[in-house]
């Protein structure tokens, strides 16, 4: 695992970016995050969780000036992001911890929207804010998302429109309650259920975000099949 040196300043916000083979988008995502929080006067620490990418993602991350936590092998999203989250856990165990943001590496320039999640948390609207995409980008027939929505309802009674959105912000106190994240694509369902069961309030904020869509292609359907398998496993693990 590689990690660049952390900021010497205590951050107001810590952003953990999940990435796998995102060399073409990760620099734009990091730059958008840094610029957006700087405009709000926030000291931000950006940590990229690289799930052992086979392209130049790790190199691009360091060139962009973010910290890098690289998985020693491909662990899946939940496992790789857990490694990065453990790097920042000491910060959230201190008094007045920073807000923690989670996002995907393929947001590119639309990552400038994420401070609105932090604002929702700071305003006391919720303890865990989940971004709901205001426009649909690609995707399949909604089977995997529908299952995820129903699983969360069954496990903790919440009704979410964006149950597997990876764009989230949380009070620092929430992070220890949801780490380690559920394996692979079960990460977001597990996080939501664990936070709700720990007594934290989960809310949604509509944002105008875009990401790399898989679409109704063979590759897309295989991807959603893997997602659905992980969704079933995370539901079974939390019954």
PLM features: residue spans?
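Hydrophobic helical membrane-anchoring modules
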Residues: 1-11, 180-239
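Alpha-helix termini
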Residues: 35-41, 88-97
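Short, well-formed alpha-helical segments that are part of the catalytic scaffolds
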Residues: 22-37
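Conserved donor nucleotide-binding strand/loop of the catalytic core
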Residues: 47, 58-87, 91-94
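Acceptor/aglycone-binding surface of glycosyltransferases and processive sugar-polymer synthases
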Residues: 72-88, 99-102, 110-185, 212-222
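Donor nucleotide-sugar binding loop of glycosyltransferases
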Residues: 22-25, 53, 110
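Short beta-strand/loop segment that forms part of the nucleotide-sugar
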Residues: 17, 41-52, 69-71
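A conserved acidic beta->alpha catalytic loop
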Residues: 50-58, 107
